[in-house]
Amino acid sequence: MPSPVLTLTKEERICSKKLIEALFAGNGSRSMTSYPIRAVFLEQKSAEGEPPVQLLVSVPKRCFKRAVKRNGVKRQIREAFRRNKHVLADAVTGSGRSVAVALIWMSADLSATHLVETKVKDLLVRIKERL
């Protein structure tokens, strides 16, 4: 079995304001929490050339006032997602569907990278089960 591609390209990041509004408007989107990360996800029809999984990462200013800390946490979350996205992508690929996922940090404390990775992986597995 070939090893999964462990990259996070521009196409896999959510930039569309319409998609962001659809994610948070509650029209078919669902959420779950694995503290300190909350995941909001939306299953949709896949367009031609669209990646199976798209990501949005948010770390609120109320959690970390300094941008350096916010950026560090975002980097941890993106890295954990990049290494584990195949869990969700394999389930969606070939079904004509795609999933948009927003990962939101909820804690005012920093966490170790391996803990963040286990939480992200747990969320991706749980999202896969709910699809």
Residue positions per predicted region:
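Positively charged, solvent-exposed patches that mediate nucleic-acid binding
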Residues: 1-131
